[in-house]
Structures are given as C-alpha cells and as structure tokens.
A protein has these predicted regions:
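N-terminal secretory signal peptides that target proteins for export/translocation
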Residues: 1-35
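Hydrophobic transmembrane signal anchors and adjacent membrane-proximal interface regions, especially
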Residues: 5-7, 44-46, 56, 164
Length: 354
C-alpha cells in the first residue's frame, strides 16, 4: 500500500510540475531560472520515487539476449528464405510468412486463418470463389511469434499439443509421438514441422499433391518428400552447405536442418528485449511516461493482471478455463461424434480442461 500512496503522490506532484512549466514558459529570465530549478527537482523526484517503486512492486526481471535460444546468423539467414518460400507447401502456393506477417504482428489479423488455397494476406485474405473456394478455414488463429524463442517456453499452440517432455523418449510431446525426427534444436524447430503436413494450413487437399497423401497415411513419410524438394534445388543445397558443418552434399540435408533454420530465423527476427519497460527494469527510472507508470501500477496492483500475466514473458504457461462458450467452428477432436472444440482436453484427456 505504501508503494501505491507514493505513486499517487507522484502523479499529483507531476501534475503540479506540468502546470508550473506551462505557466512559466516564455516569461522573464527570473522565472525561466525558477522553471529550470523546477525541472531539476522534478527529475530527482521522479528518479527517487521510481527507484523506490521498483523495490516495492513485484516486477519481473528484464529480458536479455541470453534468455533466448542461440540463433546462428548463417542458419537464420537461410531460415528467412525458407520461411517466405512456398516450396514447403503441398501445392507450393503458401509460405509460413503468409500467415505470420510482419504487418500484422507476426500473425495474420484474422480470427480464423485462411491457409492453403486462399488469396492475399492479412485481414484481406479471402477463401476464393466458386469451384476454387477452399473447403475449410484453419480451425484456430495463427499464433504471434514474438519471444517464442525464449528458453523458458515449454509449451506451444492453443491446446498445448507441443511441449517439452520425454514421454516418447525424444524430448518432446507432439502429434508425431515417437515418429518425431531426431536432432531438433528446440521447441520452435519442432513446431515448424507440423504446418507443412496439415491439410488446411499448408499441405492441401487429398489428391492434389503427394505431401498430403503421405502425411495422412504416416506423418513421418511426408517430411522426406518435402526435404527432397530442397535437395533438388541447387541454390538451397549450396546455402545449406554454407550454414551447416555436417552437410557436404544434397544427400546430407534432412528435415531437421530445414526446421532448425526456420527456428533460428524466428528466434532472431521476433525477439523483443529492448522495450522501454525492459529499460525501466534495468534501472532507467525515466524510461516510462507518467501514464505508463499508472498502467504499470494497475497491472501489478489492484487490477491483478500479473496474477496470470506474470514473469518476463507475461505468462505462466498454464491453461485456464475462462468460462467462455465456444464460438466459431474450432477444431473437432479425432473420433469425437460431436462437432465441438474441446480445447486443452484434446491433449490432456482431463474433463476439467474442456
């Protein structure tokens, strides 16, 4: 409570300072000198209260570059080319960057994504017309990629279907189960494997290409087929040889090299650890404005936002039932006789997660 009283006092005195500045400006030299002293005192006052505040509120530690997985520049450069190349999709008509776009915060600005077969990007992307209209939208929206390369991230996707776990003896719990490819650098590389095998995301419809047929029969047979596309592209072969020490010719390229490159790009491209808030947490008491400080007071105080949005990444990585009914088609669980999205329960088999 002491902290909040201080902040309240700070806001009031700041208002007085602003009034004084507006009234003393453009006056005579004597008043300008008074204004100068006002501004000096204001700066000292802000530093004192903000430093005191940072010790009172339970604030997270600032994010640092060392909090993220290492991103090799050569692999990241290669990953950026793969990320925006349609070669990884079944019909070669969509890339990762179609649904994870810089202009839309690394997502697509849509409530439910329009994957393979759509036209355009972002909110203006459409499902096509007539016989070319896609059969189904992506059941859930495209995740934003910011800071997913942080080392503490242990679970991905809305239902947590990709997580760090040794349940299958390969370090990760995924839809591929024990058929997950080896030599994956991190959980981002793991996640990058799956959109290219999903019918409504990147793979396409049955009968249109070999990738979707292989993925449907046995998922781990689709990845070699995708890899062969890269192996047959001489420009990519040279880039892989340059980026990876264990690649001497096209036959050495594996799906793990492809997704490890994409992961390296995501880590480097969407890492945020230099915001004004990070600067404030490092001790720069003037990094945040008065309004931002008020918001921080609420966020970590009586609004209780930080109860769930905690830590340096503003998440505790847990799942909660927030008492909202399903709206939209969602993702129906395999073999479920009802058309419904059971959310986290699809992964956990726990009725409390429905």
């Amino acid at each position: 409570m002491h902290c909040f009283l201080e902040l309240s006092l700070f806001h009031k005195i700041s208002s007085i300072f602003e009034f004084c500045k507006s009234n003393y400006r453009n006056k005579n030299q004597k008043n300008k000198n008074i204004l100068k002293h006002f501004l000096t005192f204001q700066s000292i006052f802000i530093v004192f209260l903000n430093l005191n505040q940072s010790h009172s509120l339970e604030l997270p530690k600032p994010l640092e570059k060392s909090d993220f997985h290492y991103s090799d520049p050569k692999k990241a450069k290669l990953g950026s080319l793969l990320f925006y190349d349609k070669i990884l999709s079944g019909n070669q008509n969509i890339s990762c960057g179609t649904c994870h776009h810089h202009d839309f915060g690394s997502s697509d600005g849509l409530a439910l994504g329009i994957g393979e077969g759509g036209n355009g990007v972002g909110p203006n992307r459409d499902a096509g017309k007539g016989i070319h209209k896609i059969k189904k939208r992506v059941p859930r929206n495209s995740l934003a990629l910011w800071n997913l390369g942080a080392k503490e991230i242990n679970t991905l996707l809305h239902d947590g279907s990709i997580s760090i776990s040794n349940i299958y003896g390969n370090e990760f719990n995924t839809p591929a189960q024990e058929w997950l490819p080896p030599n994956l650098d991190n959980i981002l590389a793991v996640q990058a494997l799956f959109p290219m095998t999903k019918q409504f995301e990147m793979a396409g419809n049955f009968g249109e290409n070999e990738i979707i047929g292989l993925a449907h029969r046995k998922i781990d047979t689709a990845w070699p087929a995708i890899t062969n596309r890269i192996r047959s592209n001489q420009k990519y072969v040279e880039l892989f040889k340059y980026a990876f020490d264990d690649i001497d010719d096209f036959r050495d390229i594996e799906i793990s090299h492809i997704v490890n490159s994409i992961a390296a790009f995501i880590v480097s491209e969407w890492a945020s650890y230099d915001t004004p808030f990070d600067d404030y947490l490092r001790g720069n008491a003037s990094a945040l404005t008065s309004n931002q400080l008020k918001g921080m007071e609420l966020f970590y105080g009586k609004a209780n936002c930080s109860t769930c949005h905690s830590g340096s990444l503003f998440t505790d990585q847990n799942f909660y039932s927030i008492a909202l009914p399903q709206f939209g088609p969602g993702r129906t669980r395999l073999f479920d006789p009802y058309t419904r999205d059971v959310g986290r329960m699809a992964e956990s088999d726990n009725l409390n997660d429905m």
